[in-house]
Amino acid sequence: MTQQRRDAHSTEFGLWLREQPEIDSSLGFIASNLDYIWKNYKTGDWMLIEEKRYGNKPKRYQKDLFEMIDRACYGARGYKGFHILVFENTSPADGRILLDEKEIGPDQLLEFLRFDGIGV
């Protein structure tokens, strides 16, 4: 049976999807959203970022989807990868930051978002 959301962060469409037996996860259907497509339109550099809060990590099915997307994008002009950004709480301002499982600080996060180093 399709897993119901445990939070209030879904859209009406997302809620509707979960109620449809014709596309239930037991039939093989899964869905996941992607949090950020981050781009510098002046340089053409771009990357994909999945944000997790409260120290959560992507579920196995999400990792599989994200790896599939990363492989499809690999080699595209300006593509700088698919990255997982985990906040200990809700943002860089209220706790630790993990980028691709490595702890960084807010300044390093800004460098990363400017495509100036980390993981790029």
For each feature predicted by the language model, list its residue ranges.
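Active-site metal-binding core of divalent-cation-utilizing nuclease and nuclease-like domains
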Residues: 1-41
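Catalytic cores of nucleic-acid endonucleases
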Residues: 29-31, 44, 53-104
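Domain-level recognition of nuclease-like catalytic cores that cleave nucleotide substrates
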Residues: 5-6, 11-18, 83-120
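Conserved catalytic cores of phosphodiester-cleaving nucleases, focusing on short active-site segments
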Residues: 36-38, 45-54
